[in-house]
From Swiss-Prot:
The keyword Ribonucleoprotein applies. GO terms for molecular function: rRNA binding; structural constituent of ribosome. GO terms for biological process: translation. CDD domains: Ribosomal_L22. This is Large ribosomal subunit protein uL22. It holds the Pfam family Ribosomal_L22. This protein binds specifically to 23S rRNA; its binding is stimulated by other ribosomal proteins, e.g. L4, L17, and L20. It is important during the early stages of 50S assembly. It makes multiple contacts with different domains of the 23S rRNA in the assembled 50S subunit and ribosome.
């Protein structure tokens, strides 16, 4: 039994979000939620919301017991990039890349 939750177009760099995702992969949902709650990273808050959604999906749609769930898969894919221009000295300009992510969490029974 698996339950999936996604957050598409999350406004965070995939590189930064993967740091948090790698920490909770394979852990029980209780451990993962605890770890995310006390993390200072912006990505931790976003991943926590997706994880809570996946847990709710498992409970509501599959009738799963929360105590038996673990983070089976979690991955962060690259979303679209917004390109912006930053004016610089002497008429030049730099490109600013505002990256986004697609966060996917899959929870399953042990």
């Amino acid at each position: 039994m698996e339950a999936i939750a996604k957050h598409n177009f999350a406004r965070i760099s995939p590189q930064k979000a993967r740091l948090v995702a790698d920490q909770i992969r394979g852990k029980s949902v209780d451990q993962a939620l605890e770890l995310l709650t006390f993390s200072n990273k912006k990505a931790a808050e976003l991943v926590k919301k997706v994880l809570e959604s996946a847990i709710a999906n498992a409970e509501h749609n599959e009738g799963a017991d929360i105590d038996d769930l673990r983070v089976a898969k979690i991955f962060v894919d690259e979303g679209p990039v917004m390109k912006r221009i930053m004016p610089r000295a002497k008429g030049r300009a730099d490109r600013i890349l505002k990256r986004s992510s697609h966060i996917t969490v899959v929870v399953a029974d042990r």
